[in-house]
Amino acid sequence: MHEMSLCEGIRGIVEDQARRHGFATVKVLRLEIGRFAGVEKAALGFAFDVVMRGSAAEGARLEILDLPGRALCYDCGEEAAIEDRFDPCPLCGGGRLMPVGGDEMRIKDMEVQ
């Protein structure tokens, strides 16, 4: 389950930010996760609760914000939202697409005290 290692990375970031900015507790942590990031959200939620024990984020509410998949169409030159990596261009029907968004995962923000 790679979600556990993702949460370990999040914990490291939280601990670093707590030292830098002097907060003791994270109340809410918001993650942006792209459609194509390959993250199982239920597993991430479980791993988050386990990995954050003993950290500033112990007991924090995890909010996940879904980011759409995006691709550049080489046929029409436009960028568009797509549901699946192998979808045709929703604008022109072309099949030559290069994904340009939706594979990211990042901390958007945290509510701290």
Curated annotation (Swiss-Prot):
Query: Which superkingdom?
Result: Bacteria
Record key words, sorted: Metal-binding, Nickel, Zinc
Residues that bind Zn(2+): C73, C76, C89, C92
Q: Which Pfam families match?
A: HypA (PF01155)
Gene3D superfamilies noted in UniProt: 3.30.2320.80
Quick one: which residues bind Ni(2+)?
A: H2
Gene Ontology BP, a term: protein maturation
Tell me the GO molecular function terms.
nickel cation binding; zinc ion binding
Among InterPro entries, the record links this protein to:
Hydgase_Ni_incorp_HypA/HybF_CS, HypA/HybF
Q: Tell me which family the UniProt entry assigns to this protein.
A: Belongs to the HypA/HybF family.
Which function does this protein serve?
Involved in the maturation of [NiFe] hydrogenases. Required for nickel insertion into the metal center of the hydrogenase.
Q: What is this protein called?
A: Hydrogenase maturation factor HypA
